[in-house]
């Protein structure tokens, strides 16, 4: 359905021209895409969120529905069978799905991080095979970089690869791999130069590894604080043989490939936090209009009004930053600066929401308790809040040193 919307009366070239200019208004096609995603979110995700949170079951049926509507992997180009949507359009979908449930959203859009390095560094054969498969079927792919001793410090990756003939042999373990139990293929980063003094930019090689390759062991599903239906596991590689044609980008350039993916995907992470915050504001306002204290609805108390107004202001500011970062990607500009600003500010506002609900917010009968648990991960993945601040400060200082101003 959304594939057709993306090809309506506005041509793709004209649409790209419009989305590549900062605008405070969405065009009609973007509004239709957003409305369709939000309709699916409210009708399918919201009613099922608590069930999947409790069971921890992977939401295959919902994933299949999302794929049939064009809501899964919408950024895959048309030439590989996808809808060919822009980053901004994809961001609108992530925001709308996250309004319903960020765990279910991650089940649907989780392959995005694995897609990015293939899109950036893959050759035509790799893109046709692996992006084409994701466009054709509701399957999962995983970004397989984090290790037990290497999270934000990607240079600390210990998984190694050794070239033998026309193959590479991979050995090592990866941790916290989203979708790891169901992935048809993995993006894997491994150290190809054993010399610890070799710069990161030359020490690692990136691979596409098929999920059914001999030597891959998928660990148990982790029991996480939030987003419980998302499948997170340890993946172990023991003498895994990968053909040379599955090297992604030049040998030794894997670190750059892995890091470049974040510039494409951070707007989506920010959009996930944004959709959750949007839901928080809606739940807060509805509760304030219903709950009574001291003889009137709590919405009539100034302290509550201040809380709601602060949430509304911060939400709209985050939305503008997130949309700007998505527009930056469509414009070929690094998005980390703006996306990092948006992704690093979520949890304090969720805490205020919990305070508004008081004891009811501490109880699972109300949605706030789950929203609080689901929100925490946004301070961690694709760079902790502290790492996001480092990214922001480095880009800021570099820009001032070069241009004499902080204005980007």
Swiss-Prot record:
UniProt: FAD binding residues: 143-152, 176-178, 291-293, 301-302, 355-359, 384-386
Domain of life: Eukaryota
A GO CC term assigned to this protein in UniProt: mitochondrial matrix
PROSITE patterns on file: ACYL_COA_DH_1 (PS00072)
Transit peptide: 1-5
Cofactor(s) needed by this chain: FAD
Enzyme class: oxidoreductase
EC number of the protein: 1.3.8.7
Reactions mediated catalytically: a medium-chain 2,3-saturated fatty acyl-CoA + oxidized [electron-transfer flavoprotein] + H(+) = a medium-chain (2E)-enoyl-CoA + reduced [electron-transfer flavoprotein]
Pathway(s) where this gene product acts: Lipid metabolism; mitochondrial fatty acid beta-oxidation
BP GO terms, sorted: medium-chain fatty acid catabolic process
Quaternary state and interactors: Homotetramer.
Family that this chain belongs to: Belongs to the acyl-CoA dehydrogenase family.
Name of the protein in its database record: Probable medium-chain specific acyl-CoA dehydrogenase 2, mitochondrial
Source species of the chain: Caenorhabditis briggsae
